[in-house]
Amino acid sequence: MKIMSKLNDQQQFRRDKLKNLVKNGFNFPSSTFEHDNLVEINEKFSQKSKEFFLENQVKIAFAGRLIRQRGPFFIIFSQNLQIQAYISKKFQKKNEFIFANLDLGDIIEVSGYLFKTQTGQLSIKVNNFSLLTKSLHPLPDQYYGIENPDEKYRKRYLDLLVNSESAKTFRLRSKIISLIRTFFDSQGFLEVDTPVLHPVLGGASAKPFITYYNSLSQNFYLRIATELPLKKLLVAGFDRVYEIGKIFRNEGFDSTHNPEFTSIEFYQAYANLEKIMDQTENLFRFLFEKLNLDPANFDFSNKKINFLEKFARYDMIEITSKLMNFDLKSANFADLVEKAKKEGVKIEPFFKKGHLINKFFEKFVEPTLINPTFIIGHPIEISPLAKSNPNNPNFTLRAELFICGKEFANMFDELNDPIDQLSRFQAQIIEKNQGNQEASEIDNEFVQALEYGMPPAGGCGIGIDRLTMLLTKNESIREVILFPQLKPKKD
């Protein structure tokens, strides 16, 4: 059991004040007033003259955190605004005990009448005051905030209190998710919820988190994708579905990866890959428009990105061959192995030709894709859920969207042939036995669903955290996840 570290003077003073308050009946009371909407109050009255308030009594009530005090002026943070309250010396003296035990960071409730100061600042003259919550720690400096990044992520609640940019980021994240819902809802998509715990691993290539289901005496996986249950709904006749939710992949974390992340997957019956690429492109344009961002000259990661022009589209093997100056189409597996060794590409025991083509793409092409670019035609070995290309069965009707050298979306013309799907799953089992820890298992229930007939469809997955990084211009995923996973803190 961890023993609490010794209190510093400030913490001890605050605890002593709390003891005094408790002795005199303080018990962290509930709020007593109906609170006003301060945003509306500010919009309605901020431009009124001093004389207006002399002629009209406007009474308001609200609660918030005391963040600064100068004499009779108290700055209260409430509803994402800083409101100035005037509390006269006479009122403070009348309530001397409470004010003697008040500290910055305490949560207070006030009511009174609006007025304008000599400098024209909208303020409230307080005639009712109560202490709701006693803060036992001083807040970080309002100007400097929390300088240690690790501490900022561990104590995000403090970061949000003192860092307006952090607070702005997460309000914008909420708006982005709301806009995504609006985009799909307006097109007749149905939002659904599917299980987080899966008895069979599938839907993506990733290492899973494993848990144990006591009542079933069976291991389950935290989902690595929502793809398979959503495609079952296509079988069920739900022609347009999407899900926004948490995904879990038991892998490392860096500036663009977190093991627990949020994604949207959407599926549309009777849509092909071209339609899904257009839909994805339209979603980005919709978000830029609604967020009032400049699509033609968007600054991100010290680069100018153009979202206004139609997104580029390249065939994977063609652009990789071009940038490598090496003909991947005519090369056999032995040629690719030799080339991989020369280029320092690690070769796994389960690799086939398609795996190596993908590795070459990641090394030579991916970092060069700055403007929005769809890469089309992935090898069948790395795309077990996508339809094969009828003109070249070794490749698939699959695309990924890259921006600034990073993947932002992954989409397929969805495989709906149950015989082919079972064969793909069986190939994944062979890979797993050869050491591929990210290979899928055979999901017989999904195959059976396909046997009843799934309409031709297109689908896409987009990481919302990475999308939020882009739209808020943050270069670390930890800046857009409220409580990112961190290494255990050393005592």
UniProtKB/Swiss-Prot annotation:
Binding site for Mg(2+) 2: E407
GO biological process, one term: lysyl-tRNA aminoacylation
InterPro entries linked to this entry: Aa-tRNA-synt_II, aa-tRNA-synth_II, aa-tRNA-synth_II/BPL/LPL, Lys-tRNA-ligase_II, Lys-tRNA-ligase_II_N, Lys-tRNA-synth_II_C, NA-bd_OB-fold, NA-bd_OB_tRNA
Enzyme Commission code: 6.1.1.6
Any GO molecular function: lysine-tRNA ligase activity
Nucleotide-binding keyword on record: yes
Summary of subunit composition and partner proteins: Homodimer.
Stated family: Belongs to the class-II aminoacyl-tRNA synthetase family.
Name this polypeptide is given: Lysine--tRNA ligase
Source organism (scientific name): Mesomycoplasma hyopneumoniae (strain 7448)
Gene name linked to the record: lysS
